[in-house]
Amino acid sequence: MFAPLLKKLFGSKNEREVKRMLKAVQSVNALEEQMIALSDEQLRGKTEEFKARLAKGETLDQLLAEAFAVAREAGKRVMGMRHFDVQLIGGMTLHEGKIAEMRTGEGKTLVGTLAVYLNALSGKGVHVVTVNEYLARRDANWMRPLYEFLGLTVGIVTPFQPPEEKRAAYAADITYGTNNEFGFDYLRDNMAFSLEDKFQRELNFAVIDEVDSILIDEARTPLIISGQAEDSSKLYTEINRLIPRLKQHIEEEEGVVTQEGHYKVDEKSRQVELNEAGHQYVEEMLTAAGLLAEGESLYSAHNLGLLTHVYAGLRAHTLFNRNVEYIVQNGQVILIDEHTGRTMPGRRLSEGLHQAIEAKEGVNIQAESQTLASTTFQNYFRLYNKLSGMTGTADTEAFEFRQIYGLDVVVIPTNKPIARKDFNDLVYLTQEEKYQAIITDIKDCQAQGRPILVGTASIETSEYVSQLLQKEKIEHKVLNAKYHDKEAEIIAQAGRPGAVTIATNMAGRGTDILLGGNWEVEVAALENPTDEQIAQIKTEWQKRHQQVIEAGGLHVIASERHESRRIDNQLRGRAGRQGDPGSSRFYLSLEDNLMRIFASDRVKNFMKALGMQSGEAIEHRMVTNAIEKAQRKVEGRNFDMRKQLLEFDDVANEQRKVIYHMRNSLLAAENVGDTIAEFREEVLTAAINGHIPPQSMPEQWDVAGLESTLQSDFGLKLPIQQWLDEDDKLYEETLRERILAELVAAYNEKETQASAEALRTFEKQILLRVLDDLWKDHLSTMDHLRHGIHLRGYAQKNPKQEYKRESFALFQELLESIKRDTIRVLSHVQVRREDPAEEEARLRREAEALAERMQFQHAEASALAAEQDGAEEGAVATATAPVRSENKVGRNEPCPCGSGKKYKHCHGQIN
């Protein structure tokens, strides 16, 4: 009741934030004349002055006004662009670790320079994160002159970059890259075997461009580095042959069965479920195909893998459609990002689903993978000391940003009022009528000389609209995952008079559509443009620009509503940039996925009650409200899914932090001898306790079992029973001490045979290797636990609590296994010394093996050359077997060096 009154009196939280920042803007403006008076050298010198002041104890907040004034003046001199007051507010929002919502065309890239410059002064590095490599390169190269003018260095991280180049990029003051690359480099760093192999410094400050796309749309996609597991391609092919024989079970909402079948499809949750008849039929088919033993159940423990394959095949055939969820290109199944419409090369679906789709499409089935390291964007970006972001649409997701990332959203006022007209949705009964109306709208706008952008939700739809336009002989450009390489070129000219561009979802996001086209792209296309040519191009562009503005600006047509209002707003936001005129309209039908799956029957009944004729559209607020309600419902469900993913991943994340901290400590340590000694004592104590329980009677002792364990696990052959028979005073504690002393002595002997330095290096390598191997297996176990944990709900248990409890027990076991396996390997390591002849022969063998490998690589290169140049086949050298020239010296024989010691105690080294 009082909320609206209070809001009227004091303004909204956002208005108060903007008002507070306007005071700081005045401070920056007051310094403008002072900065104008400085020479280039003096302006550049400000950077060193700020760094010195920071070193003396001043804070970044205290430097803000001056640093922003310097960045603004540098922008004017280098880029010919002056930051507006609202852009200064955007920069302050980013510096404070918040999300700045700025409308399309308000200069987000330029806004970023303010916060990036200020925070780079600390020397701890700033990461600028973009959604794709093209934008990372474009923004880095665009802003590089500004940063370098101010004395800062800029780097770009890209996939498949040489290590030295990548290390230099991370060492720069400002590093540009994609969210994927930053995340994968973090995982790679935590698989490195030395500190020199690591790339990233401490994660200090990140500015995320299109923050909603990265932190929300991609939050459910984990980052995984994996290695190959066993090959099951034949099984996928066999099961793929059986799946088409299954029929879908279709039931109307009233419970009336319209088609008896074997499985049900739930489109809302994107799941497939076999029914009783389906299970029986699948078992019969698998038995007939020889994949399931006679009389065996699909649900017996050792057949669960087979059941997973069946479900993967079912989902591949029912829920994944070519040109919608994926495309087939060069014999590979490449996924499409549902939010951007871009392809995601290299990204694969897990749980055998990708292989099932490959089998369905008849392409080469790639081997399944085993996870080596993984994290989520949610957990990776929360590692930064300070995080901020920019986007055109964040306000609808403000609650999620606050809940999960602790980030507030500030809506930055536009520099000029928005002049775009957003028309009400038009809803048709069928898709055919809807597309006909879209074509009519395109023709009308083209006749007026207005550019048109048609937004579609899938490649399939974009190609269908393209076919309709071809029939009408309307010239147009298609921008989807198949033609992404032409993206920048198509978007650059999408604002020309009468231009028609079809784009899947938000393909082309991050590049502005300039009314009249982009004259800079035309200039760049010329080899050595003269001043006259540039002037002519600008004049022609000015005419086109004016023509489009007078016609009404860019018209955005959306062929359907997306699940998220935010994606719809992004599409609308392509029109009406920087106060330009423009308009937008959504065309819907009752056959659209969102309407069919989520919109209530009330809307459908309401439209039928109106007695709508074919080709008629309804334009009513009630329908628009119902659609928005459906979208909110879907957004809420997606948020719950992301939150649930985070709650589960938080458990794994805590474990990840412990393991990665342990790994980093090991890499930094020069000597892990003390750690190994602690492990040795703990592992030995646990082994002894297993056979001689603490505070137990000698009658309860399993001496034979202890002797066997000591030999198998520690390589110690100790006569414990003999010790006990000979010494009555040997009780539990003294026996433990004596065994430990024997183990330490045996290990020390190895150290005397080899150098202490060599053994320390070996210990470190073994510890890292054991840790990595066991962590990899632990990730796989956690994955299996997570996929089956929901079943605990049937036993009236809380799945989340059960997951936390069991994963903690698994982690405790992992830590014990790391100690146990490390000591086991180190206890069994053999230390030996070769005689000179044997050493020479070994070195020769190694050299020949290396030569053979080089020959193979060279032979491969020759084969390529032969194909191209018709070169003659080269002869392959054969390896000669090494000949021993002296007799081998036994380990217990006198050392040939004449020291008088046994050979094994004199010249020995680690094998």
From Swiss-Prot:
EC class (word) = translocase
Question: Where is the sequence biased in composition, kind Low complexity?
Answer: 873-883
Question: What cellular component terms from Gene Ontology apply here?
Answer: cell envelope Sec protein transport complex; cytosol; plasma membrane
Q: Positions of the region Disordered?
A: 865-892
Provide the residue positions that the database annotates as binding ATP.
87, 105-109, 512
Q: Which reaction does it catalyse?
A: ATP + H2O + cellular proteinSide 1 = ADP + phosphate + cellular proteinSide 2
TM spans (from-to) = none
Which superkingdom is the protein from?
Bacteria
Cofactor list? Zn(2+)
Localization, per the record, is: Cell inner membrane; Cytoplasm
Provide the GO MF annotations for this entry.
ATP binding; metal ion binding; protein-exporting ATPase activity
Enzyme Commission code(s) on record: 7.4.2.8
Q: What does this chain do?
A: Part of the Sec protein translocase complex. Interacts with the SecYEG preprotein conducting channel. Has a central role in coupling the hydrolysis of ATP to the transfer of proteins into and across the cell membrane, serving both as a receptor for the preprotein-SecB complex and as an ATP-driven molecular motor driving the stepwise translocation of polypeptide chains across the membrane.
Q: What is this protein called?
A: Protein translocase subunit SecA
